[in-house]
Amino acid sequence: MANVALLSAASPSTSSAAPRLRHVARRRPSRRSACPRSAASRLSIMAALGEDPIRQWILTEGKATKITGVSSIGGGCINSAQCYKTDASSFFVKTNGRIGPSMFEGEALGLKAMYDTNSIRVPLPYKVGSLPTGGSFIIMEFIEFGCSRGDQSALGRKLAEMHKAAKSDKGYGFYVDNTIGSTPQINTWTADWIEFYSKHRLGFQLELITQRFGDSAIYDKGQRLIENMHPLFEGAVMEPCLLHGDLWSGNISSDTNGEPVILDPACYYGHNEAEFGMSWCAGFGGEFYSSYFEVMPKQPGFEKRRDLYLLYHYLNHYNLFGSGYRSSAMSIIDDYLRMLKA
């Protein structure tokens, strides 16, 4: 496991771009979860006790001598988000009063891995830690967003550059398990992509559905697909590329110069085509794909595999939000079983 504590050494003064406002913590609008205790109340308690590790880091490693303001920023119910303004720069802080540092450690490792490719802009993580009142926090770079999601052509090209630049000699997986939304995402290193995707993506989601909803019908059909999907990959050259992992419209923006920004990842090393699994709510258009495939050429059978990668996210949405997503997932499974005559 990589040492997340080392991220604290990446102070704002060593970053290639100074932190900017405004980086918003966002998840899918429909995501439902019990909201954590008010971030403002937690922070005020810590301040009163003089035990605020966020302020301590900002006023030491963050190179600030004074915090000039703290304000809440719109976000979802998984985490709370705050803007810390200082005399040195501004910082984006996410807190969670119920979950320990492991969730943010996974996010920080993913952000740092993407940042190190020098391809597409992501917020640089600075520090992950525990809160004395319970829970955890992550401090990272602020990025001031522009007025739009940016140029689709530039997004496609830079995403492909990231996939091309970052490969793993460990196989498919990641340094730690992380989360996709609030669902655990298992990233055990695996040499073979089909095995990894079968076991740790489709298989894991199907098992969760069975445990939570008792849906043996979708489980049984899903297992038949897993056992028979090898022909979908014939002729494709696959390498373990660094993926954002949760690339939907809420995790895509642009900075004030119009350059694409991606955030809130669920990173792992996987087949590059799996990055398009959230395309059903990402808004990728023709310009995006044309620019992407200029850098990362389209592999034989791409169209046949596209829905296979959508399936993982439909199954996850079934687990997160309930049976409203069941029919979409089952339709994909049934179509593949007919195609494969399985």
Swiss-Prot record:
Its main location: plastid. Its EC number is 2.7.1.172. ATP binds at residues 141-143. The active site is at residue 246. Residues 1-46 form a transit peptide. Keywords: ATP-binding, Chloroplast, Kinase, Nucleotide-binding, Plastid, Transferase, Transit peptide. InterPro entries: Fructo-/Ketosamine-3-kinase, Kinase-like_dom_sf. The keyword Calcium does not apply. The keyword Kinase applies. It is an enzyme of class 2 (transferase). One of its GO terms (cellular component) is chloroplast. It catalyses: N(6)-D-ribulosyl-L-lysyl-[protein] + ATP = N(6)-(3-O-phospho-D-ribulosyl)-L-lysyl-[protein] + ADP + H(+); N(6)-(D-erythrulosyl)-L-lysyl-[protein] + ATP = N(6)-(3-O-phospho-D-erythrulosyl)-L-lysyl-[protein] + ADP + H(+). It holds the Pfam family Fructosamin_kin. It is found in: Plastid, Chloroplast. GO terms for molecular function: ATP binding; kinase activity; protein-ribulosamine 3-kinase activity. Initiates a process leading to the deglycation of proteins. Phosphorylates low-molecular-mass and protein-bound erythrulosamines and ribulosamines, but not fructosamines or psicosamines, on the third carbon of the sugar moiety. Protein-bound erythrulosamine 3-phosphates and ribulosamine 3-phosphates are unstable and decompose under physiological conditions. Belongs to the fructosamine kinase family. This is Protein-ribulosamine 3-kinase, chloroplastic. It comes from Oryza sativa subsp. japonica (Rice).
